[in-house]
Design a protein with these regions (language model features):
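Helix-coil boundary and N-terminal low-complexity module in membrane systems
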Residues: 1-100, 107-203
């Protein structure tokens, strides 16, 4: 029964997350709230999905939105670089292309970390980004696991129309919350190393 209850919680959480992302600009705050709730679920804490989601959404709205806009600008910039570089066929540009892929992987890793960081720790936006960079490299095995999962999802989206449709359907039911829950299992292990003894510094 507990397993079934958790499945229903993840479905409910997924629907709330999708609803909260509709304005698009709110995706950052919604992602931080999603991470906040799934980490609580992993730890067996406060089970109130609706209340906890909107609590975190409100608390991290400004910070989450700022980081979300920043991340969009970063990936637009990287996309433009790829567009320019892919039109060149020299060896130099081939090397630059490889380096650019490395930058993309690092940027993606940082943004996988930063929303959970702001949802769990009280810190400035700059410090949150610094912490995300530090954790990206400081916990490389966990980072690689998250990148593989993210890469697999992106691959399925690009593989064929059928697999893309499958990803869309699953995402609409429970995909976002399930992936966030899996990531939160990893974040639980990571964050415990940085949590202060005093609860005042943790949301």
């Amino acid at each position: 029964m507990e397993f079934i209850a958790k499945i229903f919680d993840l479905i409910l959480l997924n629907l709330i997350f999708i609803f909260s992302c509709v304005p698009i600009i709110t995706i950052g705050a919604s992602t931080s709230a999603l991470s906040y709730v799934t980490l609580k679920m992993v730890r067996g804490e406060d089970p109130y999905i609706w209340q906890n989601f909107w609590k975190s959404f409100r608390q991290n709205f400004k910070q989450g939105t700022l980081i979300w806009v920043f991340s969009i600008l970063i990936f637009i910039f990287l996309g433009m670089d790829f567009y320019i570089i892919n039109s060149q066929n020299t060896v130099l540009f081939a090397v630059i292309r490889i380096l650019l892929w490395c930058v993309c992987l690092v940027a993606l890793s940082v943004f996988l970390y930063v929303f959970p960081v702001i949802s769990h720790f009280v810190c400035s936006t700059t410090q949150a980004l610094k912490n995300a960079v530090f954790m990206t490299f400081g916990h490389l095995p966990y980072t690689l696991v998250m990148l593989v999962i993210t890469g697999l999802i992106l691959y399925l989206c690009a593989c064929s129309v059928k697999t893309f449709a499958l990803v869309v359907v699953i995402s609409g039911i429970c995909g976002f919350s399930v992936v966030a829950f899996i990531y939160s299992i990893l974040f639980d292990r990571i964050f415990k190393k940085y949590e202060p003894k005093s609860p005042d510094n943790i949301e």
